[in-house]
């Protein structure tokens, strides 16, 4: 069992880095689970859960735990015992449930200046139906201007969407810092600058390689 959480605000690059890690460690049985992808899939399919989730996301708010937790934990467990997590748990209620059912080994906090985050978000191209986002500098689409999965056109965020993104950054600061403080007290959290995805990937991959070479992965990082 080895579970890694990539934690960072919108625009921090956690999704890009998480996918890089999964590609690197896929031969060792690692899978990728992103709470955002799970939610966007339900929104795209118009499920009851997706409709309810969309109403909160449109306001720049997180989906309440009463709606989210049961569904997302079941999907997370399906990803298997070796998984790179993107964006979950985000608050203490979610953390408690995860630690009871699927405890984490390593948490990576990505620190990026607010000005850089806003700049990245303003440059993102978005697939409206799914919410998938691309950055031309660090995570470009395979074909210019088109979504990797559907081939449909990508669009820049509108002014209204950028304002929602700014509110999401404020929500992140209020909630996720408590989760990170919990893991820091357990010495399971490492903090890194998220301004270079490649540098973060290489550093985290090295930590994972060291742990996976041992019979029992370390559970604390000094």
From Swiss-Prot:
Can the keyword Iron-sulfur be found in this entry's annotation?
no
Task: State its Enzyme Commission number(s).
Answer: 2.7.4.3
GO cellular component entries:
cytoplasm; mitochondrial matrix
Q: Any idea which UniProt keywords this protein has? A: ATP-binding, Cytoplasm, Kinase, Nucleotide-binding, Transferase
The record's InterPro entries line, in alphabetical order, gives:
Adenylat/UMP-CMP_kin, Adenylat_kinase_CS, Adenylate_kinase_lid-dom, ADK_active_lid_dom_sf, P-loop_NTPase
Task: Indicate the family of this protein.
Answer: Belongs to the adenylate kinase family.
Can you state the subunit structure given in the record? Answer: Monomer.
Protein's name according to its UniProt entry:
Probable adenylate kinase isoenzyme ZK673.2
Source organism of the structure: Caenorhabditis elegans
């Amino acid at each position: 069992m080895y579970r890694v959480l990539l934690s960072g605000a919108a625009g921090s690059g956690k999704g890009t880095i998480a996918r890089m890690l999964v590609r690197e460690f896929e031969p060792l049985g690692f899978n990728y689970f992103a709470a955002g992808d799970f939610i966007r899939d339900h929104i795209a399919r118009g499920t009851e859960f997706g409709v309810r989730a969309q109403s909160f996301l449109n306001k720049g708010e997180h989906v309440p735990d009463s709606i989210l937790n049961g569904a997302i934990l079941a999907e997370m467990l399906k990803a298997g015992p070796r998984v790179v997590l993107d964006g979950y748990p985000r608050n203490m209620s979610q953390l408690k449930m995860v630690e009871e059912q699927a405890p984490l080994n390593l948490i990576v906090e990505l620190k990026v200046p607010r000005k850089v985050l806003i700049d990245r978000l303003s440059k993102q191209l978005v697939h409206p139906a799914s919410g998938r986002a691309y950055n031309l500098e660090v995570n470009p689409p395979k074909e210019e201007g088109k979504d990797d999965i559907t081939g449909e056109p990508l669009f820049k965020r509108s002014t209204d969407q950028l304002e929602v993104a700014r509110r999401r950054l404020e929500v992140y600061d209020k909630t996720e810092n408590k989760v990170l403080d919990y893991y820091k007290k357990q010495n399971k959290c490492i903090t890194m600058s998220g301004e270079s995805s490649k540098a973060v990937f290489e550093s985290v991959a090295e930590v994972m390689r060291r742990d996976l070479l041992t019979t029992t992965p370390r559970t604390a990082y000094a």
